[in-house]
Amino acid sequence: MIFPIRCFSCGNVISEVYDEYKTRLSNVESPEEILNDLGVTKYCCRRMFASHRLENGKELFDDIVEYR
């Protein structure tokens, strides 16, 4: 699934910090620390990052595209 532009609950724009989140996550930083530094404070917005699958720097979308 492609990362959403806005939080589903409150509507805040969250995609603007996603690239930095993804980069820092690959550098083995804690997700809690990253989101605090990026200013993502609402639980609903943090949920959007926590529930988005990232494995070895790849998203679920990257796996699905291979079977197109």
From Swiss-Prot:
PROSITE patterns: RNA_POL_N_8KD. The lineage of its organism: Archaea, Methanobacteriati, Methanobacteriota, Methanomada group, Methanococci. Pfam families: RNA_pol_N. DNA-dependent RNA polymerase (RNAP) catalyzes the transcription of DNA into RNA using the four ribonucleoside triphosphates as substrates. Part of the RNA polymerase complex. Belongs to the archaeal Rpo10/eukaryotic RPB10 RNA polymerase subunit family. It catalyses: RNA(n) + a ribonucleoside 5'-triphosphate = RNA(n+1) + diphosphate. Binds 1 zinc ion. GO terms for cellular component: cytoplasm; DNA-directed RNA polymerase complex. The keyword Protein biosynthesis does not apply. This is DNA-directed RNA polymerase subunit Rpo10. Zn(2+) binds at C7, C10, C44, C45. The keyword Transcription applies. GO terms for biological process: DNA-templated transcription. Keywords: Cytoplasm, DNA-directed RNA polymerase, Metal-binding, Nucleotidyltransferase, Transcription, Transferase, Zinc. It is found in: Cytoplasm. HAMAP family: RNApol_arch_Rpo10 (MF_00250). It comes from Methanococcus vannielii (strain ATCC 35089 / DSM 1224 / JCM 13029 / OCM 148 / SB). SUPFAM superfamilies: RNA polymerase subunit RPB10.
